[in-house]
């Protein structure tokens, strides 16, 4: 049973909304960490939906505030809120002693089966189901993990829906730019190189390298498990 959620978020302007009644019981404006307590706890097999918005200040001449750029945006889920607080735990024993904490025993034992299930990517989740709809400028291409399911234009916005057919690690990113696309294939694998116009001098070499890597690794390690390589 889960009666509260620890939400770790950045200093960017954010809003959070859960789909069940809750109370904000702690708001740490220094480390941007909140604790929400639910009126009705989450039971085994239950689920919880979190809607959130994240905004940032615009970039200036001397300060980089935003990864959203005019023609070359790269966003990852590290810009989004995450669950838990482990990243803020004090690890140095002298510092822990100063605050009356016991010595650092945060590293799990090699025999800890729960810890063995964690990945180096994140602490709040390991393998996830992924689907995303991304909106960008009408003259740009947005890229996300997974296979493109649908693409459409609505007004001055262009939309892309991506979905992965198997679980992925809890790290994903979004790219958007005025891309050109160089396409080819290797066996049944779709190959794509996204590039800016004018930066096409080595596309053939890159594509040749992709095919060589697929051929070598499939022969010496295991068959390539996906339907595309971008």
Locations of regions flagged by a protein language model:
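Residues that flank catalytic or metal-binding motifs in active/ligand-binding sites
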Residues: 3, 12, 32, 128-130, ...
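Short, ordered beta-strand-loop transition motifs
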Residues: 27-32, 150-158, 184-187
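Extended, low-hydrophobicity, Ser/Thr/Pro/Gly-biased non-transmembrane segments
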Residues: 51-172
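A surface-exposed beta-strand-loop module
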Residues: 2-73, 118-119
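Extended Gly/Ser/Thr-rich low-complexity repeat segments
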Residues: 48-53, 170-185
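Hydrophobic (often cysteine-bearing) scaffold residues that line and stabilize catalytic clefts
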Residues: 44, 48, 124, 206-213
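Small-residue (G/S/T/A) turn/hinge positions that recur once per unit in extracellular repeat modules
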Residues: 20-24, 143-149, 177
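Juxtacatalytic substrate-recognition/specificity segment
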Residues: 132, 178-230
